[in-house]
């Protein structure tokens, strides 16, 4: 939907599950969104960048959310590959 200025404005922007690419619908109250902050290895302080992961309720119901978070953070380089 566009307004008079030609900018896109939507009332609801659906999210996608980071693990399964399923669309998280509005009534999925079991879904979560995690924001993981990157940490400077020298100082141990949080930097300005974060990475967001959304998990749908179906993944959480199957008990696969912890494995999915580990897989996604390894892929993004937040966790070490040999973790």
UniProtKB/Swiss-Prot annotation:
Family matches, as InterPro entries: Ribosomal_eS21, Ribosomal_eS21_CS, Ribosomal_eS21_sf
Chief location: cytoplasm
GO biological process: translation
Keyword set includes Transmembrane: no
A single Gene Ontology CC term: ribonucleoprotein complex
Subcellular location: Cytoplasm, Cytosol; Cytoplasm; Rough endoplasmic reticulum
A GO MF label: structural constituent of ribosome
Keywords on record: Cytoplasm, Endoplasmic reticulum, Ribonucleoprotein, Ribosomal protein
Quaternary structure and interacting proteins, as annotated: Component of the 40S small ribosomal subunit.
PANTHER family to which the protein is assigned, alphabetical: 40S RIBOSOMAL PROTEIN S21
Protein family: Belongs to the eukaryotic ribosomal protein eS21 family.
UniProt-recorded name of the protein: Small ribosomal subunit protein eS21
Organism: Biphyllus lunatus
Higher taxonomy: Eukaryota, Metazoa, Ecdysozoa, Arthropoda, Hexapoda
Gene encoding the protein: RpS21
């Amino acid at each position: 939907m566009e307004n008079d200025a030609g900018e896109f404005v939507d009332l609801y922007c659906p999210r996608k599950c980071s693990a399964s690419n399923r669309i998280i619908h509005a009534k999925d109250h079991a879904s979560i969104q995690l924001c993981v902050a990157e940490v400077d290895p020298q100082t141990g302080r949080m930097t300005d960048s974060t990475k967001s992961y959304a998990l749908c309720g179906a993944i959480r119901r199957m008990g696969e959310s912890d494995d999915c978070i580990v897989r996604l953070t390894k892929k993004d380089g937040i966790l070490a590959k040999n973790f």
